[in-house]
Curated annotation (Swiss-Prot):
HAMAP family: UPF0735 (MF_00707). It comes from Acetivibrio thermocellus (strain ATCC 27405 / DSM 1237 / JCM 9322 / NBRC 103400 / NCIMB 10682 / NRRL B-4536 / VPI 7372). SUPFAM superfamilies: ACT-like. Residues 71-146 form the ACT domain. Belongs to the UPF0735 family. Pfam families: ACT_4. InterPro entries: ACT-like_dom_sf, ACT_dom, UPF0735_ACT_dom-cont. PROSITE patterns: ACT. This is UPF0735 ACT domain-containing protein Cthe_1377.
Length: 147
């Protein structure tokens, strides 16, 4: 017999507080701020049994419609610190970096893809790309995908 799960998207304001506290305890544990379940449940104010009862059944919903998810592609020269410079420009614009992938340099050039969430960005994506293109060693850039 198959156990099929059903999922519902529910506004947090109507959920029993225990669910919100379980999610908060999971977040605290995942961040490493607290190392064990006892301390985490004590901090958020729930019992261990409530935590264990719900921990595998409640998850936060990350709203990607708040901001678009954009995948950027760069070809960069093999300079020490060039990836760090690109990441710093993205961070300065308050974009949320989701993934970074850098290939091994071949003939002095490396391909880099960075996926960002733009919901909290403080400037236009075009301005960000113009800023990144001014970094010495950035040879090519493009937007690969938008969601």
């Amino acid at each position: 017999m198959r156990n099929t799960s059903k999922y519902y998207l529910v506004d947090a304001s109507v959920l029993p507080k225990v669910f919100i506290k379980v999610v908060e305890a999971k977040r605290i544990l995942a961040s490493g701020a607290i190392k064990n379940v006892n301390e985490a449940v004590r901090k958020v104010g729930i019992s261990r049994s409530a935590y264990y009862k719900y921990k595998d059944h409640i998850f936060p919903f990350y709203e990607t419609s708040q901001g678009k998810v954009i995948t950027l592609f760069f070809t960069v020269e093999d300079y020490a610190g060039i990836l760090s410079s690109i990441i710093n420009r993205i961070a300065d614009s308050k974009a949320n970096i989701i993934t970074i992938n850098q290939n091994i340099p071949i003939n002095g050039l490396a391909d880099v893809t960075i996926t960002i969430e733009t919901g909290q960005m403080t400037r236009d994506i075009k301005d960000l790309l113009d800023d990144i293109s001014s970094i010495e060693g950035v040879k090519r850039q493009e937007i690969l995908a938008r969601e």
